[in-house]
A protein has these predicted regions:
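Zinc-dependent deaminase
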Residues: 1-27, 101-177
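Short loop/turn microsegments at loop-to-beta-strand junctions
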Residues: 12, 33-35
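Small-residue (primarily alanine) positions within well-ordered alpha-helices
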Residues: 20, 24-27, 37, 51, ...
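Short loop/turn motifs at secondary-structure junctions and domain boundaries
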Residues: 28-32
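Short beta-strand scaffold segments in enzyme catalytic cores
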Residues: 35-43
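Short beta->alpha transition motifs characteristic of CBS
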Residues: 48-57
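A short, polar/charged loop-to-alpha-helix boundary motif
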Residues: 56-70
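Helix-adjacent hinge/juxtasegments
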Residues: 73-109
C-alpha cells in the first residue's frame, strides 16, 4: 500500500472550491453542465492551483469528458503518473469513473460540494431532459475505499454554494434564476 502524503491535519480551502464554482459557471455559459474542478498541489505549508476547468461533456460530444478526468490527465501530463501531494476539488461528487481515476493516479485527497444524492434528487424533482443524467450510483467514497489507498474525502464542502449551480443558467448578467 502506498503512502498518501496529504497531512492528517489537512483542511480544504474555500478559495479553491470557489474557483471550481467559477469554472462551473463558465462551463454553463458555453453550453455545458455547470460542473467545475480544481487540482491543487501541496508543497510544504503552501497549496497552489495547478489546474482548473469546467465540464465539457456536452460541448465536446464525448460522454467521458468529465472535468475531473480532464484535470487529472492535464496534471499527470506535467507532474507524472502518481499525484499523492495533489488535491482534487470538484463542485459535484466524482462519479465511479472519475473516482477510479483518482485511485489510479493516487491522488492525495478529494473534496466535493454536492453529493450524488443531491444530483439525483434535483433531476427527479425537475424532470427536465437536461438533468436526466445517466448515473452509476456508486459513491466516490466507496470506490476510493476499494482502491485501498485511504484517500481522504471531504464531502459536502460549500455544499449550498455548489447546489446553486443546479439553477445557474447562462445569461448576459450571469445571475441565478
Amino acid at each position: 500500500m502506498d503512502r498518501i502524503v496529504i497531512p492528517p491535519t489537512y483542511k480544504p480551502k474555500k478559495k479553491f472550491m470557489q474557483l471550481a464554482i467559477v469554472e462551473a459557471k463558465r462551463a454553463r455559459d458555453r453550453g455545458d453542465y455547470a460542473i467545475g474542478a480544481v487540482i491543487t498541489q501541496l508543497s510544504g505549508n503552501r497549496e497552489v492551483v495547478i489546474a482548473s476547468a469546467g465540464n465539457r461533456v456536452k460541448t465536446s460530444g464525448s460522454s467521458i469528458k468529465h472535468v475531473e478526468l480532464e484535470t487529472l490527465k492535464y496534471v499527470s501530463s506535467g507532474y507524472g503518473r502518481y499525484l499523492p501531494d495533489f488535491v482534487l476539488y470538484s463542485t459535484h461528487e466524482p462519479c465511479a469513473m472519475c473516482a477510479g481515476a483518482c485511485v489510479w493516479s493516487k491522488i492525495g485527497a478529494v473534496v466535493f460540494g454536492v453529493s450524488q444524492e443531491d444530483i439525483t434528487a434535483y433531476g427527479k424533482k425537475h424532470g427536465t431532459e437536461e438533468f436526466k443524467w445517466r448515473a452509476c450510483l456508486i459513491s466516490c467514497k466507496f470506490v476510493l475505499e476499494k482502491g485501498g489507498l485511504h484517500i481522504p474525502v471531504f464531502d459536502s464542502f460549500l455544499r449550498l454554494e455548489c447546489r446553486k449551480l443546479f439553477r445557474y443558467r447562462a445569461s448576459q448578467t450571469n445571475t441565478f434564476r
